Regions:
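Short amphipathic alpha-helical surface patches that mediate protein-protein
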Residues: 31-32, 57
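TPR repeat positional signature
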Residues: 10, 29-30
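A short, ordered amphipathic alpha-helix with a cationic face
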Residues: 1-3, 28, 45-46
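Alpha-helical initiation/capping and key positions within long helical/coiled-coil segments
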Residues: 6, 25, 88-91
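Charged alpha-helical initiation segments
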Residues: 1-23
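Long, charged low-complexity segments
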Residues: 38, 42-109
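Alpha-helical solenoid scaffolds that mediate protein-protein interactions
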Residues: 14, 33, 40-41
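Solenoid-repeat scaffolds in large eukaryotic assemblies
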Residues: 26-27, 33
Length: 109
């Protein structure tokens, strides 16, 4: 049995907001989904750090540099949330989806 993660739930909520047009809320939800995915991966691999960027770097040593790229996209969604249009959000959404999928794959295996 697969367990739905908080990352998946945030991702679904963000997709719902995107359909309704609440772009700032969308960016925040996508960021939360990515953050939860990082937390799940850190738990899975027993990784600790002073901040989430340290954890992402340590995860990249295990899982590959894509983790850094995915996290960068998610971080951009959050830091530039008031400036992004729907098309850019959809583009960076893919980084979040990849990160959530990676976390689910590793956590549920």
């Amino acid at each position: 049995m697969l367990i739905r993660t908080s990352a998946e739930i945030y991702l679904e909520e963000a997709d719902e907001f995107l359909n309704k047009g609440g772009l700032v809320d969308v960016c925040e939800k996508y960021y939360k989904a990515a953050r939860e995915a990082i937390i799940l991966l850190a738990y899975k691999y027993n990784i600790h750090g002073d901040n989430i960027e340290d954890i992402v770097t340590k995860l990249a040593e295990i899982l590959g540099d894509n983790v850094i790229s995915y996290w960068a996209g998610a971080s951009l969604l959050y830091t530039a949330r008031k400036e992004l249009d729907a098309e850019l959000i959809k583009m960076y959404r893919q980084d979040v989806v990849e990160l959530v999928n990676l976390a689910n794959e590793k956590f549920n295996s």
